[in-house]
Structures are given as C-alpha cells and as structure tokens.
Amino acid sequence: MEHTYQYSWIIPFIPLPVPILLGVGLLLFPTATKNLRRTWSFLSIFLLSIVMIFSLYLSIQQIIISCIHQNVWSWTINNDLSFEFGYFIDPLSCIMVILITTVGIFVLIYSDNYMSHDQGYLRFFAYMGFFNTSMLGLVTSSNLIQIYFFWELVGMCSYLLIGFWFTRPIAANACQKAFVTNRVGDFGLLLGILGLYWVTGSFEFQDLFEIFNNLILNNRVNLLFLTLCAFLFFMGPIAKSAQFPLHVWLPDAMEGPTPISALIHAATMVAAGIFLVARLLPLFIVIPSIMYIISLIGIITILLGATLALAQKDIKRGLAYSTMSQLGYMMLALGMGSYRSALFHLITHAYSKALLFLGSGSIIHSMEALVGYSPDKSQNMILMGGLTKHVPITKTAFLLGTLSLCGIPPLACFWSKDEILNDSLLFSPIFAIIACSTAGLTAFYMFRIYLLTFEGHLNTYFLNYSGKKSSSVYSISLWGKEDGKKINRNFCLVPLLTMNNKKGASFFSKKTYQINNNVRNQTLITVANCALNKKIYYYPHESDNTILFPMLVLLLFTLFIGAIGIPLNQEGFNILSKLFTPSINLLHKNSTNFVDWYEFFRNATFSVSIAFFGIFIAYWLYKPFYSSLLNLTLLNSFQKWSSNPSCWEKLINCVYNWSYNRGYIDTFYKKSLTESIRRLAKQINFFDKRIIDGITNGVGITSFFVGEFTKYIGGSRISSYLFLYLSYVSLFFLFLKILN
C-alpha cells in the first residue's frame, strides 16, 4: 500500500505532456503536428484514463483501510521560513480526482467531434490538458502555498477557455469579466492565507488544524482577527464557485465552447471552491460566525440562482444559473457542518449537470443546421421546441438529467439534495423554508427548459412569438421579452408543408461555411422548391455517435451514482460514509449513523411532492401552448381563473423583469464600479499626461528657452559670460545676507 502511495505525486503531471508537446510541435513542426490532430485527442484521453484508473485504485484502498497519506519535500529551509511541497491523499482528494478524470474523459471524447470543425482544435486540447493538470494539482496539494499556485493556474486556464473564440467581442468580454471577478476573490484568498500563516506559522493542513484549534481552545489569539482571516480566505471560494455577490461571471462564461461549460462550469472549476471550503472545514468549524456566514452566502445564492433562471432564453445560461443555485446548496451544507451531504451533492450534481450541458451542446449542434452558427440563435430556446422526434436520444438523456436535478427518485440528485433539505430543517427553520421552496423553483425552471426545447412544435417557423396584439391583458411572452424587429415575418412554414414539390428534396448536400475564420463541413437537408424562392434548412438531426456515447455513459452515472450514499443496513452503512470515515471522525467524533426509515420516507415524500408541484406548474403554464398552438401569453392564462388580473400582471411582470435583468446586479456593478473606475482612470490619465508630463516637459522647455536667451545676451563673448557669472554670484550672496 505504501509502495502505491509513493507514486501519487505523478498524478497531476500525467496529462501535462499533451500541452507541452503540442506547444513545441506547433512551434517547430506545425504542419506535421496539425496532420496528427486526431492523435492528440486520443493521447489526451489515454493519459487521463491512466489517472482515472490510478485514482479508482486509491479510492478502493481508502474504503478498505481508511487512512490519510501525506508526503512532503523541503523547498527552502532557514530559521524563519520554510516552504515545502508534496501531495496529500485522503478521501476528499480521491473523490475529486475521480470526478475530474471521469467527466474529463467523456468531455474529451465529446469534444473530438464537437470541435472537429474548428481551426483551434489543437489549441483547445492543449488548454484542456493544462486545465486538467492544474485541477489535479489543486486537489492533491499538501499545503496552502501549493493550493494557491494551482488555484491561479486554474483561473488562467478558465480565462483561456472562456475566451477560446476571442475574435468574438462577447467572448472576449466574458473572459475578462471572469478574470477580473475572480481576481477579487483571489486577492482575499491570498490575504487570508498570509493571515493564517501569521497566526499559526505553518502552511501544512495537519499542522494548521492542530495549532489553530489549540489557539482557540486556550484563548491565545484575537478571535476577531481570526474571523477576518477566515472570511478573507472564504472570498476565494465565493468567487470560484460563483456565490453571491461574486457570481456575475458564471452566466457570461457560457460564451466558451459547450464542452468547456460541461467540464469547468459543472464538475471541476466551480467545484474547486466547494473543495477548498471542505478541505479547510476543520478550521472554519471552530469559528461559529464564519460557519453562519458560509451558510448565509449559500442560502442567498440558492434563491438568487433559482429566481434568475426563471426567464432565461439562452439554454446554457439557464443551466449556468442552475449550477449557481446547486453550488449554493453545497455551500449551505458546508456552513451547517454537513460535510458528507455537501460532497455527496457535489458528486451527484457533477454528473447530472455534465449530462445536461453535453445534451445542450447536442441540441445546439442540431439547431445550427436551421438557424446558423450564431449563439444568439442556436442557443435560443425561442427558436426550439418539438425536438423530441428529431433528437430522441438527446431528449431522453436530457429528460433524465432534468428529473435528477429536480430531485425525483431514484435518480442521483434526489438522494443528496434530500439530505441537505433534512439537515436544513435541523439547522434553521427559515433556511429550511427557503431551501425547500427553491427545490420547487428548481423543478419549475428545469422543466421550463425541457418543455421549451423538446415539446410542442418547432418554433423556428412561427410568425408570432409574443401573443395577440389586441389582448386586453399586458402581454408578456412565455419565451421572453417581445422583440418584433428581430422576427422574420416573411418566413412561412405553410408553403413548405402544403406545396407539391415534384422535384423533391435534395438530401445531404455538402457545403462549406465560414464562421469567424473557422471552416465547418456540414451536411444539411435543403429544399429545392419553395414559395419564397429561397433554400430552407429543414429539420434538426441527431448528433453523431461520438457525441451521444459520452452522454449515455453520464446517463448511467446519473441513474446509479446515488447508490453510493444509500444506507445498506439499519446502522446506516454506505459506501460514501465508509470512504469519508477519517474526515467525518475529525468533524463529528461521537456521531452515529443510525437510520430512521420512517423519517426518511416522510421527508423524501415531502421533498418529492415539492418537486412534482414545480413540474406540474411548469407543465400547466407551458404545455398547452404547444399542444393547441394557441398564440397566448403567460398573463392571458392567468386571466382564465384570476378575478384580479392586474395583481397577477404586476407580480409576474416584476418577477420576469427581475430574472431577465439578472436581478439588476450586473447593472449595479456597471454603474457603481465599472463606470466609476473608468472615470477615475480617465482622470488619472489626464493628470498623468497634463500635470505630471506637463511639469517634466515644462522644465525641459523652460531650460531650452533660458539657454537660448542666455546665448543671445552673451553674444558668444567670454567677457560677457564672466560678467553675467559674477553678477549672479553677487546677487546670490546679497540674497543670503538679506536673509541673515
């Protein structure tokens, strides 16, 4: 066993050869490197598979032996300061390595097809390899210095991947926004690390926990200062895990390729903040005020993320706000001290959300044949609908992922979310009410996404999205704000469906399209005859097998991964508790695992009822519009049974505007911070150029003119120079005499 652990240091470096070789190859042998492009994807998958197998073996050993292994080497040694580096293998590290590698492998397989058209294919795999190395290094680090080093590398990789299509201004702005927002959190993290070192004198986790607990128990340190250091440290996870108020970067990060959203913004990078809080939880747990702040940030993020997801039209942004809300559940669990529940939900959510993001990528891939390659169109749920018969495999996978996130048994997220809801009932009634209500909102907005995408009829060909103009009720579209200027009202589906096309349709026409310097060979189905005398890209199609295979495997994880947390006997034994035994004993040394099955079924029935209520509301509000093809609006539906429609108008309009405008938080930051900083920068620039540079240039110009004037007076005669010199010296001495 010891012989196996001594090779754990190599885990972060196994995926590293791919980005290094790609960089060297593109620099020295660009043609040969590009010709072997598929080889690089295979090599990336192979190397990450090695890490996955190794991590699975370590996890099995953890379950059997239940131990923590650490090995460090000294970097610098002196009397005052000592830096060490090494690796730290415990259940948390094993779980995170398995998550990173399993999701990473399937995302790489998916990306091989999804990114095949892109000229940045090799650059994409180089970034992905470097990102995997950074994440693996982060979760196996043995001290805070290593964690901060890999933490920054993860941030850099996310910046590169979010701005992968940097020629698009929106993507460039999104990666800058993510970078700047995370800088705020990372600055707090650095200050927190330095503060903890100043108090304890150590960066190593084991020493840090022991010294910190002794200082608290013996009352030998200022508790207020410790609380400040812990809060500054917590700012890093707030930004990285998109918690309020540093969550604003996550929806804009969807401008990157969809595989990036599945890997970084579902399973790995945003989970890094949860991982860091879980790693330092023995430190936080002795400061009650910090635990309350963590839980408060979590509950605010839960509610905020759910409400902001209600009116999103972009399918990926809707899933992004869902991710934000679910990360809030994990943070709430950590703030309540529910270590096991938080990590259990981290596992189940990672696989379910990765499945949903890959499913959204398959949907976008199929919609591009109809609406083009603009994200504003291919990701817009306004233009979707009726995709069930066109992409049945994607639909099934997406539906099961949606049901899992809603908390429907026996899917994965049901087991973990139910634990968090039960723990919240014991922690705070107010928090429990908010958490349970948000569970219903989660079911509502997730089924809203599903119904808008797959049910009804293909909305691309609809003439009117917003309802009847003559309606007496204030009209709010189910799909979002009315924007008549962008709707092509000359495009009609009726001639296409009723025409007698004797020539027939031409299938599988090979055409090449140029998108932002990226060439894609796409098979389209075109119609040769139409009343509009234009070619119409007909219906979506199912994705290729290399896109569907990762989704189906993640679907299996979504179905069965929850079993690791299901009690197997009356004593509550399960695989997850056995794996987390060392960490659980550290937090709750006298805890018991007895299971009350009656209480479990009662609480489960309550949480499932809330989820089904949210699903029913979503189905009731959205499904009839597709089944009957009636051109109604949301408020018109309320008018059928509401005796006072004006109240509903104001309420729904208020909720819609709040959600559509992102809670006005982005606007607040723009007005109060961005514009203020820009005005300050302009004033500083003016002061620098006009005042600072003006003084410097003025001295030079003055010296020049004084010299010219002196030369003119002297007339190039030595006697004149001597006379002026003596005159100045005499005046100087006279001035000194007057002063004395």
UniProtKB/Swiss-Prot annotation:
Function (record text): NDH shuttles electrons from NAD(P)H:plastoquinone, via FMN and iron-sulfur (Fe-S) centers, to quinones in the photosynthetic chain and possibly in a chloroplast respiratory chain. The immediate electron acceptor for the enzyme in this species is believed to be plastoquinone. Couples the redox reaction to proton translocation, and thus conserves the redox energy in a proton gradient.
Record lineage: Eukaryota, Viridiplantae, Streptophyta, Embryophyta, Tracheophyta
Biological-process GO terms, alphabetical: ATP synthesis coupled electron transport; electron transport coupled proton transport
Xref: NCBIfam families: NDH_I_L (TIGR01974), PRK06590.1 (NF005141)
Gene3D superfamilies, per the entry: 1.20.5.2700
Protein name: NAD(P)H-quinone oxidoreductase subunit 5, chloroplastic
Broad enzyme group: translocase
Cellular component annotations (GO), alphabetically ordered: chloroplast thylakoid membrane
Entry-linked Pfam families: Proton_antipo_C, Proton_antipo_M, Proton_antipo_N
Assembly: NDH is composed of at least 16 different subunits, 5 of which are encoded in the nucleus.
GO molecular function, one term: NADH dehydrogenase (ubiquinone) activity
Predominant location: plastid
Topological type in the membrane: Multi-pass membrane protein
Keyword match Transmembrane: yes
Family in the record: Belongs to the complex I subunit 5 family.
Bilayer-crossing regions: 9-29, 40-60, 89-109, 125-145, 147-167, 185-205, 221-241, 258-278, 283-303, 327-347, 354-374, 396-416, 425-445, 547-567, 606-626, 718-738
Key word Membrane present: yes
Species in which this protein is naturally found: Aethionema grandiflorum
EC number: 7.1.1.-
Compartment annotation: Plastid, Chloroplast thylakoid membrane
